UniProtKB/Swiss-Prot annotation:
The keyword Ligase applies. It is found in: Cytoplasm. SUPFAM superfamilies: An anticodon-binding domain of class I aminoacyl-tRNA synthetases, Nucleotidylyl transferase. It comes from Burkholderia mallei (strain ATCC 23344). The gene is gltX. It is an enzyme of class 6 (ligase). Its EC number is 6.1.1.17. Catalyzes the attachment of glutamate to tRNA(Glu) in a two-step reaction: glutamate is first activated by ATP to form Glu-AMP and then transferred to the acceptor end of tRNA(Glu). Monomer. This is Glutamate--tRNA ligase. It catalyses: tRNA(Glu) + L-glutamate + ATP = L-glutamyl-tRNA(Glu) + AMP + diphosphate.
């Protein structure tokens, strides 16, 4: 009988979480949802020097923002130390591990000799018990590490869902340290116990872990566990072709929120960064879950493309509810010095979003492009001299007069504009440009009738009148 699917995301809370990291949560989440399985969150916090509470918060916040909900956890490895020690004791009883007294200095010297002889540097099994072998006398006052008895012959073979068949000779693997002198278990051991206890059936993770896999499989088999399906994801490259990292300028997951990206756009982009469904570029969360499979995971490194993300975000902004965008835009307005009271006194923010969103790649950009609605106009003197000429002033005055009594609809504003253009034999830009400048303070706006409608009759008429006085 097939086991129910159980996947996991097991980040180390040692700082920064970027798109490359969070992708290792997205794919196991999607696979668990697709297979009606269980998605487990496990925090691998055994690196006490580098693990921080702030990093844990960043992981949880990033997952929540993208909607990557977990069914179990978060489990913390530091809270499972008693369990690891229990398994270590069982392994000692079964002779699966042995104490090794080789010092760091002795190990370094051994590796230097091996390198000088052109050999692969590795532990040579000095303290490994074998029938008929006489072990050295344990040095006084030295607490040993515990090493796992790796098989000496044969191979570790697994069918990787991304890489295909992988075979590693056991002769390539030395006896791994699985407990330090103070009894603290090491990373590769903790991972195996966790995956075994948590019944993980599919391990979907970055291929920087692939070298750990044969060691973990051997420990898992020694403990009588069933080997999960492994899928090792190729790395994510930045736009310069380097591995994505903070050092190479990667932005944190929440940095995208703070830059005005929508979570559905980032999730859609991230899904395509190493997986595909035919030619589909745009798809909902529900479609992604329905379509996701391990067979279509990419086998080559995926390269981040900021322009592609902007294109996707623009699509989702255009699809988004204007009231939602208005709420998302408020912090960006605040950063520009436009507070809630100012917004309340100005044009309807929801209407502004509806008008301005089509041209924007981010919510931040919508806010930046919409400040004209909430600030007094300060048109450039050169632009005024160019557009507000004596020749056009009579037409401006007539247009202002017409707007005092016109019905305040987009259609009526457009009709008034058209009538004045006809009466004064002007082309649209000759009147629209000075109106934009005097009302909005800029010549760069969407259609003039829509902009004036949002500003409102009183503001439009008073600004035109003041400029013509």
């Amino acid at each position: 009988m097939t086991r129910p699917v159980r996947t996991r995301f097991a980040p180390s809370p040692t700082g920064f979480i970027h798109l490359g990291n969070i992708r290792s949560a997205l794919y196991p989440w999607a696979f668990a949802r697709k297979m009606k399985g269980t998605f487990v969150l496990r925090i691998e916090d055994t690196d006490l020097e580098r693990s921080t509470e702030a990093s844990v918060d960043a992981i949880l916040e990033g997952m929540a923002w993208l909607g990557l909900d977990y069914d179990e956890g978060p489990y913390y490895q530091m809270q499972r130390m008693d369990r690891y020690r229990e398994v270590l004791a069982q392994m000692l009883e079964k002779d699966l591990v042995y104490p090794c007294y080789m010092s760091t200095e002795e190990l370094d010297a051994l590796r230097e000799r091996q390198r000088a002889a052109g050999e692969k540097p590795r532990y040579d099994g000095t303290w490994r018990p074998e029938p008929g072998k006489v072990l050295p006398e344990p040095p006084a006052g030295v607490t040993p590490v515990l090493r796992f008895r790796n098989p000496l012959t044969g191979s570790v073979v697994w069918d990787d869902a991304v890489k295909g068949r992988v075979e590693i000779s056991n002769e390539e693997l030395d006896d791994l340290v699985i407990a330090r002198p103070d009894g603290t278990p090491t990373y590769n051991f903790c991972v195996v116990v966790d995956d075994l206890d948590m019944g993980i059936t599919h391990v979907i993770r970055g291929d920087d872990h692939v070298n750990n896999t044969p060691r973990q499989i051997n420990i898992l088999r020694a403990l009588g566990g069933e080997v999960p399906v492994y899928a090792h994801l190729p790395t994510v490259l930045n736009e310069q072709g380097e591995k994505m990292s903070k050092r190479h300028g990667a932005m944190s997951v929440m940095g995208y929120r703070d830059a005005g990206y929508l979570p559905e756009a980032v999730l859609n982009y991230l899904a395509r960064l190493g997986w595909s469904h035919g030619d589909a570029e745009i798809f909902s969360r529900e479609q992604f879950v329905e379509w996701f499979d391990l067979e279509h995971l990419g086998k080559s490194p995926a390269q981040y493309d900021h322009n592609k993300l902007n294109w996707l975000n623009n699509h989702y902004i255009k699809e988004a509810d204007d009231a939602r965008l208005a709420e998302l835009a408020k912090p960006f307005f605040a950063a520009l010095g436009i507070d809630a009271d100012t917004i309340a006194r100005g044009p309807d923010l929801v209407g502004v979003m509806g008008l301005m969103k089509d041209r924007a790649s981010t919510v931040k950009e919508i806010a930046e492009n919409s400040t004209m609605f909430y600030r007094s106009p300060a048109p450039d003197a050169q632009a005024l001299a160019q557009h507000v000429t004596d020749a056009v002033r009579p037409a401006l005055a007539e247009f202002a007069a017409a707007l005092k009594t016109a019905e305040w609809t987009k259609e009526a504003i457009a009709a008034a504009l058209k009538a004045v253009l006809g009466a004064h034999k002007l082309k649209m830009p000759q009147l629209a440009m000075p109106v934009r400048l005097l009302v909005a303070g800029t010549t760069h706006t969407p259609s003039i009738d829509a902009v004036l409608l949002l500003f409102g009759r009183d503001v439009v008429v008073s600004r035109l009148a003041a400029a013509l006085a």
